Amino acid sequence: VWLLIEVADTTLELDRGEKLPAYGRAGIPEVWIVNLPELVVEVYREPHLAGYAQRRLARAGERISPAAFPDATVEVGALLER
């Protein structure tokens, strides 16, 4: 697994509080949480035992790329459309 994507509308507490630390412990290198209520994509990198060392917020109008595939860009606004 190079990238795991969670789409969260009502599950943000579960995704951040339980799943994210578990993904970090499992060594998943990158997690994106598509945060629909706040209209951002939370990008987590650098896994460790407690979660992730790096967190970045990306908003509509920005482009993001998985660290493992930097040439594959995604328009954040497209991920946030309902």
Task: Label the model's feature ranges.
Residues 1-26, 33-82:
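C-terminal interaction segment
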